[in-house]
Amino acid sequence: MDTSHKVYNFECPFELAKVEMKAISNTMHKVDDFVSTIDVNFSDSELDDKVDDLEIKIEKVSGPLLNRYLGSVGKVVFLIFSFLFFGSIKLVLKCFYHLFKCVFCNPLTRCFCSIIFTIIFYTLLFVSCYLLWHYFGDVIIQTIKDINNNRSVNFTNETENFNSKVETTTMKIIQLIFSKSDNNGVEHIIKSANVTSGQTANFTLLNG
């Protein structure tokens, strides 16, 4: 006879409930410990320690590779960049964490949302820097070259060049948004007159 399974005979439902509660008491105790753990607020020092641990792990993995391909100078540059980057991450993460105290009571939810919003913040920051470099990078490079070649740079001309670049880029964006083609394939583009002091800009849709 197989005795690996015990057979219980219960006279009433209360006896069954008593056995079930006894069986799950250990599991419920573990759940209570877990809930008490995630309900503990993170201090600023604990958040710093978690980000520092992540920084140390990344440096351990990338350090030998950088030293091999870029040498000691490249490794030092990376360490400086890592210090500044993770330092700013800690600052933004703590700002969001304390900001969400007014919204979320659960510290785990607050920490998760802080991480998500930190990622979104840096994504928007990098996209903005890319768009700035994409549209105005040549003007910035030319200005830096002029400063390096001649210390007495005419900033009036540089400002005019920058304003011209802004005007051209703005027109491209407006044409991209508002230009369209009719059924005959004729493209409608935006024409604008030169704007001088005291005049207004008139944008009119005309046949190209």
Curated annotation (Swiss-Prot):
InterPro entries: Fijivirus_P9-2. It comes from the Viruses. This is Uncharacterized protein VP9-2. It comes from Fiji disease virus (isolate Sugarcane) (FDV).
